[in-house]
Amino acid sequence: MSYVYFIESTNGSTYIGATINLEKRIRQHNKEIKGGALATSNKVLNGEVWSYVCYVENFPTYNEALKFEWRWKQISRILQKKNPKLTPREKRLEALKMLLELDKPTSKAMLYSDYIIKPNVVYNN
């Protein structure tokens, strides 16, 4: 299964990514094992820790997850320009809400209605 995830650092920085293994990926971001993104690794070197805010599951392919990830980041940037007072977390969550209200994430993506199971958001409590 493929996932698109939203993580937040202890200082409030945010990151959106895609993976097939959530447990391994968060360990990579926190530099417990090799393979984290440069953007998150630098924060860890400064003592920050990353944790999941939420993730979206049920993508039929990894490619569909990547399309969703790209669009989530794009909507987040648009929201930041429209309302710079939003916190990074607010911006990401609002973008996710808007993205899930669409029929599909991008013009070349599958319709959500064609997924075997519709995208589902799982929040970390």
What are these regions (language model features)?
Residues 1-3, 48:
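Residues that flank catalytic or metal-binding motifs in active/ligand-binding sites
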Residues 22-64, 71-90:
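Conserved short loop/helix modules at catalytic or binding sites
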Residues 66-67, 73-125:
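Boundary/linker segments flanking structured domains
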Residues 3-9, 13-20, 25, 29, ...:
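GIY-YIG nuclease signature motif recognition
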Residues 7-9, 33, 116-119:
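Generic alpha-helical secondary structure signal
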Residues 2, 12, 26, 56, ...:
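Generic intrinsically disordered, low-complexity segments enriched for polar/acidic and small residues
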Residues 6, 16, 56, 60, ...:
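Compositionally biased, intrinsically disordered low-complexity regions enriched in proline and serine
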